[in-house]
Regions:
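Phosphate-binding and adjacent anionic-ligand microenvironments
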Residues: 3-180
Length: 183
């Protein structure tokens, strides 16, 4: 259960950063991991997080070490029952308290691997010149190829996707899925 509170949260790097705002307000850790449910395992097992989620709508908790869609639905129903409000009211209150995040994902399917790798390589070569410059009217705070240092076993996962993080915390993420390309 959650009677002792939430120890921390985690999201995969491409996932909306909305949970970051909540974690900051609750003064709990928020971990940004590579894509792949396996990266939540060490955090869950070490009790560093209570809740986690990823960009493909997988949601879980420390009650089980796997994605649990039924749990997510039941959790939402429990929140609505406790708050005695509509989903719309709950979301409006959330946005007032934590701000509103917008998320848009674009998947490009069936691109030959050599073309996808060439595009990714070209974008990677531009990263160095982006940090500190203006992009879409905002200063680029971070321009990198995301690497993750697991806080439990100190393993490093490199080349997990390109990130541009702007001064208003909006982000542009580009990554190769490894599953949706052909060739």
């Amino acid at each position: 259960g959650y009677k002792d509170g939430i120890t921390g949260v985690a999201r995969s790097m491409p996932t909306s950063s909305a949970v970051d705002n909540v974690a900051r307000a609750l003064n709990i850790p928020c971990f940004e991991t590579p894509t792949g449910w396996k990266f939540f395992g060490n955090l869950l097992d070490s009790n560093l997080i209570t809740l986690c989620g990823e960009e493909s709508f997988g949601t879980g908790s420390n009650h089980v070490r796997e994605k649990d869609g039924l749990w997510a639905v039941l959790y939402w129903l429990q929140v609505l029952a406790e708050k005695k409000c509509s989903v719309s009211d709950l979301m409006q209150n959330h946005w007032k308290q934590f701000g509103r995040n917008y998320y848009s994902r674009h998947d490009y399917e069936a691109i030959p691997s050599n073309i996808a790798n060439q595009i990714f390589g070209n974008l990677t070569s531009m990263l160095e010149n982006l940090k500190g410059n203006s992009f879409a009217g905002h200063l680029v705070k971070v321009a990198d190829n995301f690497s993750y240092l697991d806080p439990v076993d100190n393993s490093i996962s490199e080349n997990q996707g390109l990130r541009l993080v702007l001064d208003d915390n909006s982000r542009v993420i580009v990554r190769l899925s490894g599953t949706g390309t052909k060739g």
